[in-house]
Design a protein with these regions (language model features):
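Helix-loop-helix "hairpin" substructures at the membrane interface of multi-pass membrane proteins
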Residues: 138-210
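Transmembrane alpha-helical segments in multi-pass inner-membrane proteins
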Residues: 201-252
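Loop-to-transmembrane alpha-helix initiation sites
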Residues: 20, 68-76, 95-99, 142, ...
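Transmembrane helix-bundle core of multi-pass membrane transporters
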Residues: 4-19, 90, 97-157
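Cytosolic-side transmembrane-helix boundaries in multi-pass membrane proteins
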Residues: 251-277
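Short loop segments and helix-boundary regions at transmembrane helix junctions
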Residues: 36-118, 214-226, 243-246, 269-271
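Small-residue faces within membrane-embedded alpha-helices
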Residues: 24, 28, 32, 59, ...
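Short juxtamembrane and helix-loop transition motifs at transmembrane-helix boundaries
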Residues: 6-15, 29-40, 57-67, 158-168, ...
Length: 277
């Protein structure tokens, strides 16, 4: 028992591990909450699109000498607006528009990045570096997360109605277009805050895995939120510990655990259905 406690406590004697854990936990909660809405709306590809599209914004922000999160956020919103414009003003379907917009923006980002940065910096942006999070970056992530949490709390029922049935939301006196872009804005903010943990490539997993894990286990939205948060927080905590003891990528460990939790939930739900019959 003492040995197990030592294994758990040992990493957190270092300040960089404390920052990493706190950042991962904060991001896990926000991703889990938003994940439930994205899964219900069927926006998994939208999360992937915006997460890749932030790269040129990061590069341009670096060149301009402004905070990278500002560039990432603006770039993410530009991607969302671009997809919306193509969908409304052409015969292109939304998923096709996402594919061309995010791949084009990601390619622009890669070209720009190779001209001004080394491969080491590129790896940091693509795959994240939560172990390198400073106290200032932790506070910045916490502030962004708090904004997202408050907005989701205030508009929880409106977003839920929009995700289930936009037509019903319109009849209820809500603006589906406003809710659409509001949810996209929250998605862009979440991606910006998550980028430091798992990078732009793996961020979509943190935005989808908690939601589909919860949806596999329950049909009630309130319960879904709780399960998503528990699975995401547990994966982040264990992922940070595993990455320390096995000298592995922290972001990858977190994503692997979330994938494992989904598989366990899927198997459990199948067994439960068979037993009921």
């Amino acid at each position: 028992m003492t040995e197990m406690f030592a294994i758990f406590v040992e990493p957190f004697q270092f300040s960089f591990m404390q920052n990493a854990l706190l950042t991962a936990l904060v991001v896990a909660v926000i991703c889990a909450l938003l994940s439930c809405y994205l899964v219900l709306k069927g926006w998994s590809l939208m999360g992937d699109a915006i997460s890749h599209a932030v790269l040129p914004g990061i590069v341009l922000a670096f060149l301009a000498g402004i905070p990278l999160v500002i560039g990432a956020f603006v770039s993410g919103i530009a991607c969302a607006l671009g997809v919306g414009y193509l969908k409304e003003n052409s015969r292109i379907k939304e998923d096709t528009a996402m594919g061309i917009v995010f791949s084009g923006m990601f390619a622009i980002g890669l070209v720009l990045f190779t001209k001004i940065q080394t491969s080491q910096h590129l790896t940091h942006i693509l795959f994240g570096n939560v172990l390198g999070v400073s106290q200032q970056e932790l506070i910045q992530t916490a502030i962004i997360a708090l904004i997202i949490f408050i907005l989701l709390g205030l508009k929880r029922r409106d977003f839920l109605l929009y995700c289930f049935d936009p037509s019903h939301a319109r009849v209820a006196g809500l603006s589906p277009k406003l809710l659409h872009y509001g949810l996209l804005t929250l998605l862009a903010l979440t991606i910006v805050s998550t980028m430091q943990v798992v990078g732009v490539i793996l961020v979509v997993a943190m935005l989808i895995a908690p939601g589909i894990t919860a949806l596999t286990l329950t049909n009630r939205f309130d319960k879904m939120l709780v399960i998503a948060i528990i699975s995401a927080v547990t994966a982040s905590l264990l992922g940070v510990l595993l990455s320390y003891h096995f000298d592995a990528s922290t972001g990858a460990c977190i994503i692997l655990l979330q994938a494992a939790f989904f598989l366990i939930a899927l198997i459990y739900s199948k067994i439960k259905v068979r037993l009921n019959f």
